[in-house]
Amino acid sequence: MQDFWSKAMDAVAEQVSVQVFEAWIRPLKAGGEVGDGQFQVYAANDFSADWVKKRYGGLLEEILSEQLGEPVTLLFAADPALEKPVASKTQTVTPVQSGGETGDQENFHSGLDPRYTFDSFVVGGCNQFVHAAAARVAEAPAAAYNPLFIHGGVGLGKTHVMQAIGNRVLEIDPDKRVLYISSENFMTQLINSLRFKRVFDFKENFRSVDVLLVDDIQFIAGKKATQEEFFHTFNALYEAKKQIVMTADSFPHEIEHLEERLRSRFGMGLVADMQPPDLETRVAILQKKAGSEGLRLADEVAFFLADAVQTNVRELEGALIRVSAYASLTGKPITMALVKESLKDIVRGQDRAVTVEQIQKTVANYYKVKVTDLCSNSRSRIYSHPRQIAMYLCKQLTQHSYPEIGHRFGGRDHTTVLYAVSQVDKKQGSTPALADELASLKSMLQK
């Protein structure tokens, strides 16, 4: 079991953040088999055991079932011997010193990526309003549009423009304390503060910043303790006239299981909508990206690429990287013929829009199982293999996010979907039979 457990840990580490892995997954200890495919897993205390079971138990069971070749059920329990006072490895923020001093700025980590600036952001009709609002906030934090709530689909540039605000604020005033953090990281730090009895430090850390940038705020919905703490953090910063910027995948009033008091606060400033880029903006994005990579892209090639990939900026840039790699590896110039060859699967995929329901039905028929089996909790390979294939195809052929796909497959966690997609992606290159299965299914779905 120890060998399998070690391999499982490596697999999980690829699917979760470093903070989550170090704080919650690595400390787990594998016990022995207690019969009927059930294995004991120990955490330091009941709280940790319950937390890991609820959020990552399914992912661990999925990975171990695949490695052992049979369904696995994990039984989580506490082992006080594992409890030790270790320091949290998640990002922390140094509190502002009393008396108006800013503290040691060298020890403060903003979490910002310096590549995300307003200069590197391509402005078009789809995002002009968001860009203008973000620039205004960066020039005068908390003077207008507080909070600024940016929402839109996956890969449209919300994170880019949010971090551009932070980088611009620091460019104007390097002594400002700016913090960019994902909502998942906020939740992890909160849980660690409760676990290690450092709640006061947690509160002081987050309430000492001048600008707080929170990405994917929708993920705190349904999490009572996290919503409670974020509510008080929001109020403290707002009353102190500090700037708050948030991103989400939908309007505040459309986020399910979000407390009304938070919903009203998220919408009391400016709510800005990030739309998918139009053709001209997609072309401009491609040309800017190509220029930064030292590539020369003919206009006809740029327009063809922009027309072939209409989903989001992330996939558009991914297509350009793929074309560039294909040209580099084959030693050929970037021509229309090369682009069509390197993106033939994407170009063919434009012919028909595919839904999650169609994918589930097609995969179920192909593997001679039921759609309900794909959404069930069974980890038998008879069902787990088709389920992973279906999840992979959903990510490849639809615009749904990992959490959305997980919800369609029996309410599974997004990490389970992420693992399924990565496993299929890895195996198809070395398993011709799997590659043939995927090609057949894609052909059926795109007819």
UniProtKB/Swiss-Prot annotation:
CDD domains: AAA, Bac_DnaA_C
Biased composition (Polar residues): 88-99
Record region (Domain III, AAA+ region): 111-327
Record Gene3D superfamilies: 1.10.1750.10, 1.10.8.60, 3.30.300.180, P-loop containing nucleotide triphosphate hydrolases
Region annotation Domain II: where it falls in the sequence: 70-110
Segments of this protein annotated with the region Domain IV, binds dsDNA: 328-447
Gene Ontology MF term list: ATP binding; ATP hydrolysis activity; DNA replication origin binding; lipid binding
GO cellular component: cytoplasm; plasma membrane
Residue numbers spanned by region Domain I, interacts with DnaA modulators: 1-70
PROSITE patterns listed in its UniProt record: DNAA
InterPro entries documented for this protein: AAA+_ATPase, Chromosome_initiator_DnaA, Chromosome_initiator_DnaA-like, Chromosome_initiator_DnaA_CS, DnaA_C, DnaA_dom, DnaA_N_dom, DnaA_N_sf
Keywords: ATP-binding, Cytoplasm, DNA replication, DNA-binding, Lipid-binding, Nucleotide-binding
A biological-process GO annotation: regulation of DNA replication
Binding site for ATP: 155, 157-159
Keyword flag Cytoplasm: yes
Cellular compartment(s): Cytoplasm
NCBIfam families hit by this protein: DnaA
Family label: Belongs to the DnaA family.
Record remark: domains: Domain I is involved in oligomerization and binding regulators, domain II is flexibile and of varying length in different bacteria, domain III forms the AAA+ region, while domain IV binds dsDNA.
PANTHER family referenced in this protein's UniProt entry, alphabetically: CHROMOSOMAL REPLICATION INITIATOR PROTEIN DNAA
HAMAP family referenced in this protein's UniProt entry, alphabetically: DnaA_bact
Functional note: Plays an essential role in the initiation and regulation of chromosomal replication. ATP-DnaA binds to the origin of replication (oriC) to initiate formation of the DNA replication initiation complex once per cell cycle. Binds the DnaA box (a 9 base pair repeat at the origin) and separates the double-stranded (ds)DNA. Forms a right-handed helical filament on oriC DNA; dsDNA binds to the exterior of the filament while single-stranded (ss)DNA is stabiized in the filament's interior.
Subunit structure comment from the entry: Oligomerizes as a right-handed, spiral filament on DNA at oriC.
Protein's name in the database: Chromosomal replication initiator protein DnaA
Organism: Magnetococcus marinus (strain ATCC BAA-1437 / JCM 17883 / MC-1)
The gene coding this protein: dnaA
